[in-house]
Regions:
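Non-heme Fe(II)/2-oxoglutarate
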Residues: 2-87, 105-108
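A structural signal for short hydrophobic/aromatic patches embedded in well-ordered alpha helices
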Residues: 27-31, 177, 189
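A short coil-to-beta-strand element that immediately follows conserved catalytic motifs
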Residues: 86-97
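Catalytic core of non-heme Fe(II) oxygenases with the double-stranded beta-helix
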Residues: 95-168, 176-178, 185, 195-196
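Acidic, carboxylate-rich catalytic segments that either coordinate divalent cations
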Residues: 199
């Protein structure tokens, strides 16, 4: 049984869980196959729907997502809602699922998602991605932002992602992915879904 840590660095609750290696490998293999085929890559291009200033954003087929990932996501959304408000979710509808390929100097500006619940999972990360001469090492990390800083209340939560991290959060929670200076690919997936709010 995979551990889930649910916490609120500010108002909204955020959950972090580890993705099984089997799922990571399946997604990476599928993305590599798409990238190696120009016609598939063109059909799968999802960048026009997103704000990311990155090389490639790829939509995976519903067939692939349903077969390899959906069960894991739904299970953990149910756990997340149960831990947050102690209620059982009856309906979960996955609206979108895509993969982001981020390279040196690319970034994702501050944004929020649609749906009710969103998530991000990390599939590949360059070595020493946060390396910097600065004291605050945010290169390649993700910031979650809510409200403004006040006494005894933070407005920022910074996460330095590791391969296999999956973060679940309310869709309205603003976030940004910082650029990095290292060679290599930071590969992640994101998703949006709706739940039955009557739970």
């Amino acid at each position: 049984n995979l551990k889930m840590r649910v916490f609120n660095p500010f108002g909204p609750k955020v959950a972090i869980i580890k993705i099984p290696k089997k799922i990571i490998n399946q997604i990476n293999k599928e993305v590599d196959l798409i990238v190696s085929n120009k016609s598939r890559l063109k059909k799968s291009d999802y960048s026009r729907n997103l704000v990311g200033q990155v090389k490639q954003e790829i939509k995976l087929s519903n067939k692939f997502v349903n077969k390899h990932i959906l069960k894991f996501i739904k299970l953990n959304i149910r756990r997340y809602i149960k831990k947050c408000i102690n209620k059982n979710v009856k309906k979960i509808n996955l609206k979108s699922f895509w993969v982001v390929r981020q390279f040196k100097n690319e970034y994702n500006p501050i944004h929020f998602h649609n749906g009710n619940i969103s998530g991000v999972g990390y599939l590949k990360i360059p070595k020493n991605i946060t390396k910097s001469a600065k004291r605050l090492k945010t290169n390649g990390t993700i910031d979650f932002i809510h409200g403004s800083k006040s006494f005894l209340s933070n407005s920022l939560y910074n996460h330095n992602p590791k391969i296999g991290d999956m973060i679940i959060f309310p869709n309205y929670l603003m976030h940004t992915a910082y650029p990095f200076k290292r060679e290599g690919e930071r590969r992640s997936f994101s998703f949006n879904l709706d739940i039955d709010k009557k739970t």
